[in-house]
A protein has these predicted regions:
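N-terminal signal peptide c-region/cleavage motif recognized by signal peptidases
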Residues: 13-14
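Positively charged n-region of N-terminal signal peptides that target proteins for export
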Residues: 1-4, 18
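Short, conserved micro-motifs composed of acidic
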Residues: 19-287
Length: 287
């Protein structure tokens, strides 16, 4: 019996040790800070090949009618390194919204958009939470609706839609999680229906687990606070149960988050390098 037990322990230990981050993350990437402003730049999401959308507050061209600039969306062209305001025309009332847009995600055919924005009323704790909005784009019109599971007392942020599995990931501080903000998911049923929201247990911890994204192989990436180092980026490999911290250069002494695989040659993330500093956006490209 002792021999069998020892063999089982050896097998389990071997499985844990064999688990690793995807091979392409150990390639020789060149780091470049591509967006550095006096604003907070974050919320990176892939739009199409060679383009990504991100969030920023206070950039030139944004409305400054408020004492604190609102968060809005911008487009980055990897080929030209140019930033331009993201065209929100046709996205229901999003263009006219005076409130902050927290982050956004697109289906691969760009016919479905999921975004977080703050509500217009305070909740029972006295702060204004974020809600998730679904935008379905037709040829001549678009339809916007608040996701049916949203409770106005809690925040729902950082959506990521995986077209391959028709699954929407997001973070929320709603009750029932492990603590702080947890990562949740729901699967699409038909055109307008969604499954019951589920907690992504293997990824979550008693701390804030934030900015979920997937790569083409369905490996999950997210960030959580680690001691005095700030936010670190973790990977939950497809089929695994234990998240792994990414190797350098993706994690640094500072806040590293919003890891987005544009393709296997280009990875984008947000980083706060200095305490109380602004977040900038970095590009990692293969040599």
């Amino acid at each position: 019996m002792r021999v069998i037990f020892a063999v089982l322990l050896s097998i389990i230990a071997g499985q844990v040790l064999a688990q690793d981050v995807p091979d392409f993350l150990r390639s020789n990437y060149v780091e470049r800070r591509i967006i550095k402003t006096s604003s907070d730049d974050f919320g990176v999401t892939r739009l199409a090949k060679g383009y990504f959308v991100f969030c920023s507050n206070g950039r030139k061209g944004m409305a400054r009618a408020f004492s604190k600039p609102k968060v809005d969306l911008f487009l980055y062209d990897l080929a030209t390194n140019k930033v331009s305001p993201f065209d929100k025309s046709g996205l229901c009332d999003i263009e006219k919204s005076k409130y902050n847009i927290g982050s956004i995600s697109f289906s691969s055919d760009l016919k479905n958009v999921f975004l977080s924005r703050n509500r217009d009323l305070k909740n029972y704790e006295g702060y204004i939470p974020f809600e998730l909005v679904q935008v379905d784009i037709e040829e001549q019109k678009s339809e916007c609706s608040i996701m049916s599971f949203v409770n106005s007392d809690y925040s729902y942020q950082q959506p990521f839609y995986d077209t391959k599995t028709e699954t929407l990931f997001f973070v929320s501080n709603m009750p029932g999680g492990k603590g702080g903000y947890d990562i949740y998911f729901t699967r699409r049923i038909g055109k307008f229906g969604w499954s019951a929201v589920q907690n992504l247990e293997y990824a979550n911890s008693p701390y804030d687990d934030l900015f979920p994204t997937l790569d083409a192989e369905s490996n999950l990436y997210f960030s959580r606070p680690v001691d005095a180092r700030g936010l670190e980026i973790f990977c939950l490999p497809n089929g695994a149960r234990i998240p792994l911290a990414l190797p350098g250069p993706f994690n640094t002494v500072g806040d590293d988050f919003n890891f987005s695989v544009i393709d296997k040659r280009n990875i984008v993330l947000a980083r706060v390098s200095k305490r109380n500093g602004n977040s900038d956006i970095f590009l990692y490209s293969l040599k």
